[in-house]
UniProtKB/Swiss-Prot annotation:
Biological process annotations from GO: translation
Family: Belongs to the bacterial ribosomal protein bL9 family.
Protein role: Binds to the 23S rRNA.
Name assigned to this protein: Large ribosomal subunit protein bL9
Gene that encodes it: rplI
HAMAP family: Ribosomal_bL9 (MF_00503)
One Pfam family in the UniProt entry: Ribosomal_L9_C
PANTHER family the UniProt entry points to: 50S RIBOSOMAL PROTEIN L9
GO cellular component, one term: ribonucleoprotein complex
Keywords: Ribonucleoprotein, Ribosomal protein, RNA-binding, rRNA-binding
Length: 151
């Protein structure tokens, strides 16, 4: 008997996979517990529709992320922060600060989860910051950390 898994099943497969199982295992264990449904033509067409929608959504997400990355790369980002005479910052610049700067510059929302900062920035200068956007889109920007004039 062929079944479509509705949930991950240990030693059998992952959600959405079509598996061949014995009739007893399918009818007496998987189907009653809501772990699988019998692989009929209508269920297979539902699965195909769901997979197509998922694929379209992923493509849309990737396209939006690539467009956002293109807009980000067209800009030069500067952040003015309080720092000592030696260039050491009073505090640190975090991924949340960088995300806030990007969001402000672009006039859109930008999550701190998209900023891949290994460690907080603690000195003035130019830094390469990696970005990981949804849809597995990766890129990097250069951000200039400058001492603010106000003391």
């Amino acid at each position: 008997m062929k079944v479509i898994l509705l949930k991950d099943v240990a030693k059998l497969g992952k959600k959405g996979e079509i598996k061949e199982v014995s009739d007893g295992y399918g009818r007496n264990y998987l189907i009653p517990r809501g772990l699988a449904v019998e692989a009929t033509k209508s269920e297979l067409s539902k699965l195909k529709n769901i997979e197509d929608q998922k694929k379209k959504k992923e493509e849309r997400t990737k396209a939006n992320s690539e467009e956002l990355l293109r807009k980000i790369k067209q800009r030069h980002f500067r952040m003015k922060v309080k720092a000592g005479a030696s260039g050491k910052l009073f505090g640190a610049v975090t991924s949340a600060d960088i995300a806030e700067l990007i969001a402000k510059e672009l006039g859109t929302e930008f999550s701190k989860r998209y900023v891949d900062l290994k460690e907080n920035i603690k000195n003035t200068g130019e830094y390469k910051v990696n970005l990981k956007l949804p849809g597995n889109v990766k890129g990097s920007i250069i951000i200039a950390i400058e001492k603010s004039e106000e003391d």
